[in-house]
Amino acid sequence: GALTLFAQLAIAHAQFETIHPYHDGNGRTGRLLLPLLLTAEGYPPLYLSGALLRARSSYYEALASVQLRGEWGPWLQLLSRAVVESCDESIAIARDLVTLVERWEQELGRYRAHSATRRVPRFLIGHPVLSVQQAAEGLGVSQPAANAALNNLLAAGIVSLVSERQWG
């Protein structure tokens, strides 16, 4: 039968690390393959590198177990723990973002419910760095309306100005 996506991830990473194609950066590149493969299959790009590096010695031992003895068990167990840990981290971040947006929306409560000012906070989650033009296009409003909305958020301390040139 076909291999599960988890098995494909485990094999791809272990093979990449075994081949070690570059002089430098193989570990980073190999860990970057994991979220890219997930995304290619339509899944969210879990950031597994952090969890793997927090268990650095176990990570190296598990890969060596595959490379030197063909023993996949330790690597599969470690990778599965990293997936669970990464999912937990992603859920916590998503909850924190929801809480942040709700707080911003409360702070902006004096503005009309469907105004550009009230809609910007949710848009910021997917676009944390943006120009007035990007805000206007994303919110479906004029550039002056987007500029006014961003100025309201600037006054509320929700956004900050990166540079005058980028703002206008």
Please identify what each model-predicted range represents.
Residues 166-168:
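Minor-groove-contacting beta-hairpin "wing" of winged helix-turn-helix DNA-binding domains
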Residues 90-121:
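Short alpha-helical segments that sit at the start of domains
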Residues 124, 146-156:
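Basic amphipathic alpha-helical segments that dock to polyanions
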Residues 1-95:
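Phosphate/pyrophosphate-binding active-site loops
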Residues 154-164:
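A short, conserved structural fragment
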Residues 121, 126-139:
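Short acidic, hydrophobic short linear motifs in intrinsically disordered regions
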